[in-house]
Design a protein with these regions (language model features):
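Class I S-adenosyl-L-methionine
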Residues: 1-22, 39, 71-261
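Glycine-rich helix-loop-beta junction characteristic of Rossmann-like nucleotide cofactor-binding loops
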Residues: 21-34, 60
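Conserved class I S-adenosyl-L-methionine
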Residues: 36-46
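Conserved SAM-binding loop of SAM-dependent methyltransferases across substrates and taxa
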Residues: 47-63
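Short beta-strand element of Class I
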Residues: 66-69
Length: 261
């Protein structure tokens, strides 16, 4: 059956990612300490192999009561995934057709996953996750075009004049800025190397875990309340210095600053 073969195969493929790279023990610890239903959002779920594997791992193997929602722009894929979830009685697993930027289906989430959400779609996913105070954020960004169009830095002109190098540096700087913004908004953030089973090139994984004393960054300082109390308010945020050096202003920055809705 599909349940025994496809899901099992997907779980085996993603086993290392699920248990080690993505650090699911973090969310298991959260659930153990708080018996409420775990709500997980998978933005840009695609064919949803990972979404099914997550549900299988956390619900079937770990016995957690879950509410997992996958969102994607491809309507036919969403219809198919909902049929499979219904067929195999995965009552806590559902799929929606829609754009990440327009999603208003919840005002809270324990965990937000976004793999290969193109360009600024990742920014909207990260912003929503931070706004919901999600305990865990897992993001593998791709197609970082926004910074590539803006970046200008005189000391780097010798490198940026080469299109391919400019493209790759822009992608790295995009994710560095995202990691800084996550840190400044209450998350312990790691930047890890990641290879998934459907995309052979190596990618960057942003793994962010919300700190216990976290608060959304102060609008002016870009620092959490805890950081302000510790005296770090005199230090200009890394994200601001990086953005100013590269002469960039990204969608995630604008969202956090209230310039976009």
């Amino acid at each position: 059956s599909w349940k025994e073969q496809e899901v099992s195969e997907a779980f085996n493929q993603y086993n290392d990612m699920l248990e080690n790279i993505l650090g699911y023990e973090v969310i298991l610890d959260m659930v153990r300490n708080d018996k409420t239903i775990t709500k997980i959002l998978d933005f840009g779920c695609g064919k949803s192999y990972l979404t099914f594997a997550m549900y299988y791992y956390l619900h079937e193997l770990k016995g957690l009561t879950l509410e997992v929602t996958g969102l994607d722009l491809k309507k036919d894929v969403i219809v198919h995934c909902n049929e499979l979830a219904k067929k195999y009685h995965y009552e806590g697993l559902s799929f929606l057709h829609g754009d990440i930027a327009d999603y208003t289906g919840t005002d809270s989430a324990d965990m937000v996953v976004t793999l290969h959400a193109c360009d600024t779609a990742t920014d909207y996913a990260l912003y929503k996750a931070m706004k919901w105070h999600a305990g865990v954020i897992l993001s593998v960004p791709c197609c970082q075009h926004e910074v590539n169009k803006q970046i200008a830095c005189e000391p780097l002109e010798g490198a940026l004049k080469y299109g391919l190098i400019k493209e790759r540096l822009s992608a790295l700087f995009t994710d560095a800025l995202r990691a800084d913004l996550l840190e400044e908004n209450g998350y312990d953030t790691q930047v890890l190397e990641f290879i998934d089973m459907e995309h052979t090139p190596k990618n960057i994984l942003l793994r962010a875990v919300r700190r216990v004393d976290a608060g959304m960054a102060d609008e002016q300082s870009g620092l959490t309340e805890a950081e302000q109390k510790s005296g770090q308010c005199c230090k200009e945020p890394d994200s601001k210095r990086l953005a100013e050096t590269l002469q960039i202003h990204t969608t995630l920055q604008k969202l956090l600053e209230g310039e976009l809705v």
